[in-house]
Amino acid sequence: GWRDRVYVTSKSPWWIMENPGDFEKFFDESRRAIGTDVIDFYHIHMIMHRGWKEKVLPFRLIDRIMKLKEQGKIRFAGFSFHDRLQLFKEVVESAPWDFCLIQHNYLDYEYEAGCLGPKYAAANGMGLAVMKPVRTGFLANLPASMRAALRSTGVEKPDTEWALDYLWDIPEVSVAVSGMGSMADVEANLRYASKAEPN
C-alpha cells in the first residue's frame, strides 16, 4: 500500500458546474480516478470574484465541502485563490477552512493575496500552500539584469534557490507547490529542500 505513505489532494472546478449536485459528482469522479475512498486535501479551485458570486455562494459549495469533511470523505477542506486581497479576506472569513492555496513569489509580492495573504491565513488558523513559487519557470531562468541584482548581494546561488528561499523564510508558508515536469525536477527540488536553511 501506497495510500498510507502519501497525502492525496484534488480540486473542485466550479466553472463547469451547471447545478449544485455537480459538486458531489465531480468529487466522486476524483475519488474513482485516484483510487481512494478518502481525499486528504480537497479544495474549491480557483476562487475569484465571478466564481464566488455566480457559483460558490449560490450553489452553497462551502456547505457542501464542509459536509464531505463531516462525513469523513475528506480530511481537510480548503480553497485555491486568484483575485484581490479584499476578496481573499472575505473567503477566509466565510468558513472554518483548514487550508488555502495562493500564488506567491518574490516577483508577485503585491499580486492577488500578496504578501499579506499568508499572514491573514495564519491569523485565521489556516495552513498555507503556495503555488507558482518560481512563477511558471520565469524565476528559475532570470534575465541577466535580475540575476545581476541578486548577485550584487554577494550571495551566489541558482535562480530557483532564490525563489524557494524567499518562500521558506515566510513562517506562515506550510508548503511550496512547485510545478515539475520530470523526475529530475522532483529530485532537484528534494535535494535543495533537504539542505535549505533560513536566510
Residue ranges of predicted features:
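N-terminal binding-site loop/beta-alpha segment at the start of enzyme catalytic domains
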Residues: 1-6, 64, 70
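Acidic, His- and aromatic-enriched active-site or binding-groove loops in soluble protein domains
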Residues: 65, 97-111, 154-155
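Short catalytic-loop micro-motif centered on adjacent basic/acidic residues
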Residues: 75-79, 101-102, 175-177
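Conserved, mostly hydrophobic/aromatic
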Residues: 8, 30, 39-42, 77, ...
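Structured C-terminal cap/extension of enzyme domains
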Residues: 94-96, 115-199
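Distinct, well-ordered alpha-helical segments
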Residues: 1, 20-31, 52-61, 83-96, ...
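Active-site groove signature of glycoside hydrolases
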Residues: 32-52
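Active-site beta-loop-alpha junctions enriched in small/polar residues
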Residues: 11-15, 44-49, 80-84, 103-107, ...
